[in-house]
Amino acid sequence: MTGAEVLDVGRDAIWLTLQLCAPVLIVGLVVGVIIGLFQALTQIQEATLVYAPKIVAIFISLLIFLPLMGSLMSGFMRQIAARIAGM
C-alpha cells in the first residue's frame, strides 16, 4: 500500500466520521438555539432547561438516522475489505 492509498483511506475515514456525526450535531445545535432563543425572549434563566429537550432530540435523531449511519459504515467497511483483498 502506497502513501497515497493510505492518505486516501484516511481522508475517506474522516469524511465518514463527519457524515456520521453531522445529523446528530445539527439537531443538537438547532434545538439548543431554539431553547436559547426561547429563554432570551421569556427571560427564563434556568440553566437546566436546555438539557432535557436536547437529550430527547438527540435520542430521536439517533433513532431516525441510525439506518443511514449503518449503511454508511457498512459501505466503508466493504470498501476497506475490497482494498485489503486487492493487495
UniProtKB/Swiss-Prot annotation:
Pfam family, one: Bac_export_3
Alphabetical keyword list: Bacterial flagellum, Cell membrane, Membrane, Transmembrane, Transmembrane helix
Transmembrane segments: 18-38, 55-75
Highest taxon listed in the record's lineage: Bacteria
Main location: membrane
GO biological process, one term: bacterial-type flagellum assembly
CC per GO annotation: bacterial-type flagellum basal body; plasma membrane
Places the protein is found: Cell membrane; Bacterial flagellum basal body
Membrane topology (UniProt): Multi-pass membrane protein
Family, per entry: Belongs to the FliQ/MopD/SpaQ family.
Annotated function: Role in flagellar biosynthesis.
Protein's name according to its UniProt entry: Flagellar biosynthetic protein FliQ
Organism field: Caulobacter vibrioides (strain ATCC 19089 / CIP 103742 / CB 15)
Gene name in the database record: fliQ
